[in-house]
Amino acid sequence: MAAMAVALRGLGGRFRWRTQAVAGGVRGAARGAAAGQRDYDLLVVGGGSGGLACAKEAAQLGRKVAVVDYVEPSPQGTRWGLGGTCVNVGCIPKKLMHQAALLGGLIQDAPNYGWEVAQPVPHDWRKMAEAVQNHVKSLNWGHRVQLQDRKVKYFNIKASFVDEHTVCGVAKGGKEILLSADHIIIATGGRPRYPTHIEGALEYGITSDDIFWLKESPGKTLVVGASYVALECAGFLTGIGLDTTIMMRSIPLRGFDQQMSSMVIEHMASHGTRFLRGCAPSRVRRLPDGQLQVTWEDSTTGKEDTGTFDTVLWAIGRVPDTRSLNLEKAGVDTSPDTQKILVDSREATSVPHIYAIGDVVEGRPELTPIAIMAGRLLVQRLFGGSSDLMDYDNVPTTVFTPLEYGCVGLSEEEAVARHGQEHVEVYHAHYKPLEFTVAGRDASQCYVKMVCLREPPQLVLGLHFLGPNAGEVTQGFALGIKCGASYAQVMRTVGIHPTCSEEVVKLRISKRSGLDPTVTGCUG
């Protein structure tokens, strides 16, 4: 074993030293790296949205690039292609199934608009799933083609570090592959967490890794968790007509504005999703007829209860996909609590030439556009002469529940905690989308609020919108908030009529005033 002193920059900007033992006998990998004979300028570990963005950006800057990516099958055996969580088991299939559910609602509205629709209108899970899966596969292929066009070498191998410049993997034929690079970016993302302490959870439960690839309808489904993944999955399952229950132990949508979160739950409950609040499962068993019997405890009563379901979906959070990387061989530090990789503002790990982006990183929002932008900016700093850093403030996002919740900036709770109640002004309104009127839809939970500093010019701290097309509404206002918009500037913005978006530029009533925020009338 040869000893090598490696200078490591700490997260606080200080330097510290570590003596790292490197195995010089691993087929000369370490010796080759030390001799400046590395295979690539950049090696990206992980073929998700962030990793692919890094690879394509570096190739465009004329660098020699390789991507290694491998999908460990889920406990239920589900596997997929290149593209990561977003493409295969996240944003894309989720939004498409959300759209399927919205169409079901529009079919119910259609008779009020003069369409003669024979009822009931059945939903075909197999047809929807096949269409969604075919689209995802086309995206997998598209990513392969894009890498090939940019002369990025792609390796479908499970990589692990040999030393700080080298990774090792085994190809399908059993051949061992060693790859070295001057710079390495880790972008392996995360995977759903399984409650392994619960009897039967691993054997009989599925996660978001599986739901979008089911060939048959999941039937009566229990979704366990209060995350946005739990609510989104339960929302589209209810929307396509399935009997769906959410079991949550604590508050929903932790980290989001809690007033908005409560309204999301109210809307889902009023539209058919059942909720078991303050409950935690303790056992899952398969019955002779194939159904799953779930046992849980109600924390409010202390009593045990049971129910039967066709499918149990765990949506209790995600864990970083770092377990098989052998990060200790490279000297990369991780959080002892979360196992996520620790980085500084430049996305650099404890090893100067190893970086990490996306969901695998401690303290970063787990959002696809974040990983993509952070990756591109990182590569531009490495190879393009840029000094621009990723700005993680005021990042917009949307929860695609049946009534969508879009937000950007601070929640009301965060604003009050940061600035004090006396320095925060909240403008709000209950509104009714025009499309809901003729259809006779309930708009009780259609709501918008803007969180501002109270002192002039009343800087906008956050915007929260609950209603149709919330993502489309929030995206435009996110630019204004990013640029430092004030409440007065928003109020001087002319709205587009008739739209839901215009409700944002009509917010005149503050919570402090105590006046009724319900919007009445139209065109005025």
Swiss-Prot record:
Keywords: Disease variant, Disulfide bond, FAD, Flavoprotein, Mitochondrion, NADP, Oxidoreductase, Redox-active center, Selenocysteine, Transit peptide
Disulfide bridge positions per record: C86-C91
GO biological process, one term: response to hyperoxia
PTM annotation (N6-succinyllysine): residues: K175, K329
Reaction equation(s) it catalyzes: [thioredoxin]-dithiol + NADP(+) = [thioredoxin]-disulfide + NADPH + H(+)
Cross-link (Cysteinyl-selenocysteine (Cys-Sec)): C522-U523
Transit peptide region: 1-36
Remarks, miscellaneous: The active site is a redox-active disulfide bond. The selenocysteine residue is essential for enzymatic activity.
Subunit structure: Homodimer.
Protein name: Thioredoxin reductase 2, mitochondrial
Protein species of origin: Homo sapiens
